[in-house]
Amino acid sequence: MKKLYPILFIVIINFSFAQTKQFIYDYIYVPDSTQKNVTESEIMVLNINKEKSEYFTYDRYFSDSTMLSGSKKGLFMMPPNKKMSSDRVNKTSNSNQIKFITQLGFTKYFVDENIDLKWKLYPEYITVLNYKAHKATTEFGGRKWTAWFAKDIPFQDGPYKFKGLPGLIVKIEDESKSHKFELKGIKNTNYDFEYPNLNNYSKINLDYPKFIKAYKNYRKDPAADLVGRYMDQTDSSGNFRRGVDIFREEQKREEEKIQKDNNIIEINLIK
């Protein structure tokens, strides 16, 4: 069952650069290739202004904003106990350079990438949110993709790292139907957007080849950042627990989680 989110979906006709345009996408994906009938979904946001665009998960943004607001008031707040993507993508207008931001363990990676997608255009079209959307295909991240872009929405941008078509990408899906983004709403915002910076993590700046190595190392040992973080303690029932035993339990959980997360959007990272 799809989740409902407290976002007002409004279609705006005026696409001048007077304001930041906010495009809301539904992202549906299959996390485990051995269970193709099990899907998960997230609401993704793409903010576009004259100079740049920023893409992120709505739930993560809401959580980070709430935690930042609490910290300014001296309150310690924990993020909700739910699965949320940490992926963010910042693109610069008229450039192939992007900044991909993601978190692995307790480390946040700021990855510099050069994205130059090769698109093939077709005469077919469909309608998405009353916009005529034309067909295009490309290959990216080890997958073949079919996209639909609207020339009447004059932004050469799209969800995640997708870009470079003569109109906004309003729908895109990979050949295996494991990952699909579809535009669900458009609205104007009257403020300069800035993603909340919590500063509660280690930060590493690197290029994409070095990130590939870091990502592969993380999947081999997803609990590496947890080493030394658990002290001996007494639980709520009064039972003594060694820190090393707690760590091993967490290590097992992280390894099981990684095994089930085997159908990532950039599948080439694990092949």
Segments predicted by a language model, with ranges:
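Bacterial Sec-dependent N-terminal signal peptides
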Residues: 1-23
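Sterically constrained small-residue positions within well-ordered secondary structures
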Residues: 9, 14-16, 37, 127-129, ...
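Intrinsically disordered, low-complexity boundary segments flanking structured domains
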Residues: 9-12, 32-34, 42, 108, ...
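Short secondary-structure boundary segments
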Residues: 9-11, 123-140, 145-148, 152-154
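Extracellular or lumenal secretory-pathway regions
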Residues: 19-118, 122-125, 132, 146, ...
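Short, hydrophobic/aromatic-rich segments at coil-to-beta transitions
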Residues: 20-22, 129-136, 164-171
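Gly/Pro-enriched, hydrophobic low-complexity segments
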Residues: 138-198
